[in-house]
Amino acid sequence: MKLLSLAVQDFRNLAQVELLPSPRATVLLGENGQGKTNLLEAIYFLTTLKPLRTARLAELVRHGAQTGLVAGDFDGPGGTRRVAVQVAPGGRVALLDGKPQERLDAYFDGLAAVCFAPDDLLLVKGGPEGRRRFLDRAAFNRWPAVLGEAREYVRALRARNAALRGGSPEVEASFRGPLVRAGARIVRRRRDLVEELAPRVSTAFREISGPAAPEARFAYRPAAGVQAEVGEAELAERLEHALAQRLERDRDRGFTSVGPHMDELVLALDGRGARAYASQGQQRALVLALKIAEIENLRAALGRPPLLLLDDVSSELDPTKNRYLLAYLAALPAQAFLTTTDRRLIEPAAGPDTAFYKVEGGMVSPLIS
């Protein structure tokens, strides 16, 4: 599915933007702080209904405005359709061909976007929360129903934590069932996705780093020893058992200490934890391999590559990895949006149909390439 046109109003620092992107590569040029990343976030928000950098919708609305709007025309196998999302401090409304959508299945049909930003380079050396976030965003792209499943889990988790802090045993017990059922679904999704991604991560890392590189391993480790290699019903039973074992500790501390919100992704090179033992170059190669694995997995599952959003990544990679990334993008039949402060970093991947835009002070204008 290709993005044919984009309209943005009162989103971050973007007052009003209309963009006709290239079917292949659209490059956004400008200094830092001018709105390049905001434009990428607008596209990401349109395709996922999730912001890139904040959990608060109010921060997405331009200062002084009441609401923001992002809309786009997409061309896919079923023809052209218009999707839009209105955002306000109190919430958001998704629209498909002008009609508000309560159920989002039709809205998300065919939409998938993978974003690669400098913060992603912290996936290896950062804490487990970032790795869980990566996996859950990738799972959402693979199975959009994950969005609703994650919300069910978060609701049950917050309610149980409140009951633990409030000293309400009966209320706490009433939320244990919904929590373990929703948690088991999340564990199953993560497990299935890691099984799909793991061999692709290993292959991509070897291609990036060369045949002499150590073997990259990507594995899922649920919290508290809950084994993921079972069916969903047994997963729920094991989660419930783990909760029962930790009940007194959870009551003392006022929060749930086991479940998908505490799980970990293991990244290792030749069996040694990458966070502690990998060099900076190896860590960045691993992150690049993770992103390429996600892209290739979606390409295989959907029959087409996802929309690609790359935020000033070339400036964060060494020349060898940047050449690999640009060569990969040039060979991939995908629509891509790239931001940079230095046009020379992107030029090797530019083709005759690459569109260049200048972004300055929240204004976007086309450049003659």
Curated annotation (Swiss-Prot):
Supply the source organism's classification: Bacteria, Pseudomonadati, Myxococcota, Myxococcia, Myxococcales
GO CC annotation:
cytoplasm
Instruction: Name the species this protein comes from.
Output: Anaeromyxobacter sp. (strain Fw109-5)
Enumerate the Gene Ontology biological process terms.
DNA replication; DNA synthesis involved in DNA repair; double-strand break repair; SOS response
What this chain does, per the entry, is described as: The RecF protein is involved in DNA metabolism; it is required for DNA replication and normal SOS inducibility. RecF binds preferentially to single-stranded, linear DNA. It also seems to bind ATP.
Entry's HAMAP family?
A: RecF
What this protein is called in its record is DNA replication and repair protein RecF
Q: Which UniProt keywords apply?
A: ATP-binding, Cytoplasm, DNA damage, DNA repair, DNA replication, DNA-binding, Nucleotide-binding, SOS response
Q: What is its main location?
A: cytoplasm
